[in-house]
Design a protein with these regions (language model features):
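Bacterial carbohydrate/catabolite-sensing allosteric modules
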Residues: 43, 84-89, 137-144, 148-335
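Alpha-helical recognition/docking segments in bacterial nutrient-uptake
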Residues: 3, 62-168, 172, 335
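Short beta-strand segments enriched in small/hydrophobic residues
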Residues: 16-20, 55-71, 169, 177-186
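N-terminal helix-turn-helix DNA-binding module of bacterial transcription factors
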Residues: 1-61, 333-335
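Residues at secondary-structure transition points
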Residues: 3, 24, 28-32, 50, ...
C-alpha cells in the first residue's frame, strides 16, 4: 500500500502541514525537522505526487511557448535550448504555433491557455501581434526571445548589428551593388527581420552606396525561396555583385541558383548568410553566427527564475554574434 503524508507525519511526530512544507522545500520549517521528515519519507519509500504538489503550491506545473513556426531550423534550435533547461525542472512545456502572423488565417493561442500555465515564452513575435498581446493580461511572468517589452525578461541578439557586420564585410571587399534576400516584404511583424533590413540599408547609406528596391527580393526563409529570390536578382538589368541573405537557408538556395546559372559563389557573386546553420560549413558559406540554442536556454532559465521569484527585476540580455568567413565571399572582380 502506498504511503501517504499522514503516515510520514505520524512517524515523524509532526503535522501533515509540516510534512507538506518540508518535502516541498518551503520556508518556516526547522532544518532539523525538515531533515527528519526527509529521512522518514525516504525510509518509507514515499513518492511526492506532482499533481498534489502543484495543487498545494497553486501552480499549474507548465509553461507555454508561443512561436510562429516549429519545423523551421531556427525555431527548432531555440526550442531545443528551452527543452534542455526544462528537463531539469518539474515544469511541462505546452507548445502553441500560431502560424505566420502576417497572414490573416493564423490561429492565436486559446485564451484558456492563460489559466493552465505558470509563464509564457514568446519567440520572435511582436508583442502587439494578435493572439500574443492578450497573454500580458494574465498574471504570470513572460519571457521574450528576439523582442522586448517593458516589465518582461528578454533574451536575443542585436539583429541590426549582425546585418551591419554582413554588409560591411561585402563593402570592404569592394562590392558597390549589394543585394538583399529578405523573408517577406517590409514592414513585417517579425522584429529580427525588420532590424536586419534596417542594418542592411543603414550600412549602404553610410558607405554612400545605392539603396534600391530592385536590389531586394523575398525568399520566405526557405531554401526554395532563396533560390527563387536569387534568380530574380540575377535577372535584373543591373544585378548585384554581392548578396546578404537574412538566413542561412535562404543563402543555401541562393548558392544553388548561382550554380544553376553557371556562376561560382565568391568568384562571380558573393553571398553572406545569417544563423550559423550546421550545413553552412559544408557549403562553404560565409555567415553571421548566432548562439541559437543558448538564446532558448537563457530565456527558459530567465522564465524559471521569474516564476520562482516574481519580485526579481526583469533583465534584457543581448548575446554576442560572430562572423565566419568562408569561400562564398571574395573581392569584387573588376569588369
Amino acid at each position: 500500500m502506498a504511503m501517504t503524508i499522514r503516515d510520514i507525519a505520524r512517524e515523524a511526530g509532526v503535522s501533515t502541514a509540516t510534512v507538506s512544507r518540508a518535502l516541498r522545500g518551503l520556508p518556516n520549517v526547522d532544518p532539523v525537522t525538515r531533515e527528519r521528515v526527509r529521512q522518514v519519507a525516504e525510509r518509507l519509500d514515499y513518492v511526492v505526487s506532482p499533481a498534489a504538489s502543484r495543487l498545494a503550491s497553486g501552480r499549474a506545473g507548465s509553461i507555454a511557448v508561443i512561436t510562429p513556426y516549429i519545423a523551421r531550423w531556427y525555431f527548432g534550435r531555440v526550442l531545443s535550448g528551452i527543452e534542455k533547461v526544462l528537463q531539469g525542472s518539474d515544469l511541462d512545456l505546452l507548445l502553441s504555433s500560431i502560424g505566420d502572423p502576417s497572414e490573416t488565417h493564423h490561429v492565436p493561442p486559446h485564451r484558456k491557455l492563460r489559466r493552465r500555465v505558470d509563464g509564457f515564452l514568446v519567440i520572435s513575435l511582436s508583442t502587439d501581434t494578435e493572439g500574443v498581446n492578450e497573454i500580458f493580461e494574465a498574471d504570470v511572468p513572460v519571457a521574450l526571445i528576439d523582442t522586448e517589452r517593458d516589465g518582461c525578461w528578454s533574451v536575443g541578439i542585436d539583429d541590426r548589428d549582425g546585418a551591419r557586420m554582413a554588409v560591411q564585410h561585402l563593402v570592404n571587399l569592394g562590392h558597390e551593388r549589394v543585394g538583399l534576400i529578405s523573408g517577406r516584404v517590409m514592414p513585417t511583424p517579425f522584429r529580427p527581420e525588420e532590424s536586419r533590413w534596417q542594418g542592411y540599408r543603414d550600412t549602404l547609406v553610410e558607405a554612400g552606396l545605392p539603396v534600391e528596391d530592385d536590389l531586394e527580393a523575398c525568399g520566405h526563409f526557405t531554401i526554395e525561396g532563396g533560390e527563387r529570390a536569387m534568380t530574380t536578382l540575377l535577372a535584373r538589368p543591373n544585378p548585384p555583385t554581392a548578396v546578404f541573405a537574412m538566413s542561412d537557408e535562404m543563402a543555401f538556395g541562393a548558392l544553388r541558383s548561382l550554380r544553376a546559372h553557371g556562376l561560382q559563389p565568391g568568384r562571380d557573386l558573393s553571398v553572406v548568410g545569417f544563423d550559423g546553420h550546421e550545413m553552412s560549413e559544408f557549403l562553404d558559406l560565409t555567415t553571421i553566427v548566432q548562439p541559437v540554442e543558448e538564446v532558448g536556454a537563457r530565456a527558459a532559465q530567465a522564465l524559471l527564475d521569474a516564476i520562482d521569484d516574481p519580485t526579481r527585476k526583469p533583465e534584457q540580455v543581448v548575446l554576442p554574434l560572430d562572423m565566419v568567413v568562408r569561400g562564398s565571399t571574395a573581392l569584387r572582380r573588376p569588369h
